[in-house]
Amino acid sequence: MTHETEAVNLKYEWRSTRVRCLDDQGQRIGEIGWHMIDDDQTYVIERTWVDPNHRGTAIAAEMTKKLLDKITTENKKFIPLCSFTEHFLDKEPQYRKAAYYPHDEEEF
């Protein structure tokens, strides 16, 4: 498979703690999950999942971009616990301004 987004009509289903990516048949092919902290001002991004048959198609990157766009539009912050999200930030550093790293505030 290529690293381009598949030529399907992707739909996104937003819930309070996750966003699902659905194919044109309504089947779940990807999901990002999170929980909220700081009086719902900070998303803690925990996981990114893509169906094995759809990996390598940029679906994870598209979902991550949509979620981070939502977070920045809401003027909220996020903690990237998910390794995919952290890797995504290396390629799309403009989203780092909304990233929050609690350990940066601790004194050692």
Name each model-derived stretch:
Residues 79, 84-91, 95:
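Short, compact, well-ordered microdomains
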Residues 69-83:
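Conserved GNAT acetyl-CoA-binding A-motif
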Residues 12-19, 24-42:
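A conserved beta-strand-loop-helix scaffold within acyl/acetyltransferase catalytic domains
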Residues 96-108:
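Conserved catalytic-core motifs of GNAT/GCN5-like acyltransferases
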Residues 48-55:
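A short, internal acetyl-CoA/4′-phosphopantetheine-binding micro-motif in the GNAT/acyltransferase core
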Residues 56-69:
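Conserved acetyl-CoA-binding loop-helix of GNAT-fold acetyltransferases
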Residues 2-12:
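Conserved N-terminal entry element of GNAT/NAT acetyltransferase domains
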